[in-house]
Curated annotation (Swiss-Prot):
Coiled coil: none annotated. The keyword RNA-binding applies. PANTHER family: MITOCHONDRIAL RIBOSOMAL PROTEIN S5 (PTHR48277:SF1). This is Small ribosomal subunit protein uS5. Residues 1-34 are annotated as: Disordered. GO terms for molecular function: rRNA binding; structural constituent of ribosome. It comes from the Bacteria. With S4 and S12 plays an important role in translational accuracy. Belongs to the universal ribosomal protein uS5 family.
């Protein structure tokens, strides 16, 4: 009987350890890895592939990743389980990082981006306005560190098209220095004084 009690106690200890592992690692076996990046899952879809024995299901995840300070990227992951699809999407997004020109927490000028049937218009906004945007656009802008902006979706309502149109708009932004260099003019001649003053305040 004492031996049986020891075996029962050992089993309880192992079960407790398994519970601790589940708490630490969520649904997986490994602990959750902390990351300095912001991650937003925009869409998760289930995909069915018809094979000889029936149908095989998998999941796709559209993920936005950014550092909240002017860097952002998008990734598309596919796997048999949702967490694995998201993880693949995150890694794919990190491979497509690009820098976004900003003035304070807004954008330097109005811009329109298009991708497939998606069309997104972005306009600068004064400090404290916030992100006036729908879900997919908001996810991209927040991950990019843009917190004062006006937006409008003019095309498709498909989240994938909207996300890629938003990224196309951000890639179309130019800093005042880039515009001045392209035109061969001083920065003061191509950028409003209020914009330069706002940027100087942020830098200080």
């Amino acid at each position: 009987m004492p031996g049986q009690q020891r075996r029962g106690g050992g089993s309880g200890g192992n079960e407790g350890g398994r519970r601790d592992n589940r708490r630490e690692g969520g649904r997986g076996n490994a602990p959750v890895e902390k990351t300095p990046h912001l991650e937003r899952v925009v869409a998760i879809n289930r995909v069915a592939k018809v094979v000889k024995g029936g149908r095989r299901f998998s999941f796709t995840a559209l993920v936005i990743v950014g550092d909240g300070d002017g860097t952002v990227g998008v990734g598309y992951g596919k796997a048999k389980e949702v967490p694995a699809a998201i993880a693949k999407g995150v890694e794919e997004a990190k491979k497509h990082f690009f820098k976004v020109p900003r003035i304070g927490q807004s954008i330097p000028h109005p811009v329109q981006g298009e991708d497939a049937a998606g069309v997104v218009l972005l306009k600068p906004a004064s400090a404290g306005t916030g992100v006036i945007a729908g879900g997919p656009v908001r996810a991209v802008l927040e991950c990019a560190g843009i917190h004062d902006v006006l937006s409008k979706s003019l095309g498709s309502s498909n989240p994938i098209n909207i996300v890629h149109a938003t990224l196309a708009a951000l890639k179309g932004l130019e800093s005042p220095e880039a515009v001045a260099a392209r035109r061969g003019l001083p920065v003061e001649d191509v950028a409003p004084a209020a914009m330069l003053a706002s940027r100087a305040e942020v830098a200080s």
